């Protein structure tokens, strides 16, 4: 149950192609990540809805290849 940061970014880029993504492997096991993603899709959305977009993009791997993820979303013009 692990996924590389590169694979994680590829999955996110499918839903957020113009985003700026920063991924940090928190403990070096490819299973616990901190994610910072900046995208115009977040403009006008509540924080909860921004996080829902990210979680929907990751739905194929959540609870399968990813144990823990901390999400920080940033809306950009």
UniProtKB/Swiss-Prot annotation:
Gene3D superfamilies assigned: BolA-like (3.30.300.90)
Q: Which SUPFAM superfamilies match?
A: BolA-like
Among InterPro entries, the record links this protein to: BolA, BolA-like_sf
Top-rank taxon of the source lineage equals Bacteria
Which Pfam families does the UniProt entry name for this protein? BolA (PF01722)
Provide the protein name. Answer: Uncharacterized protein RP812
Q: Give the species this sequence originates from.
A: Rickettsia prowazekii (strain Madrid E)
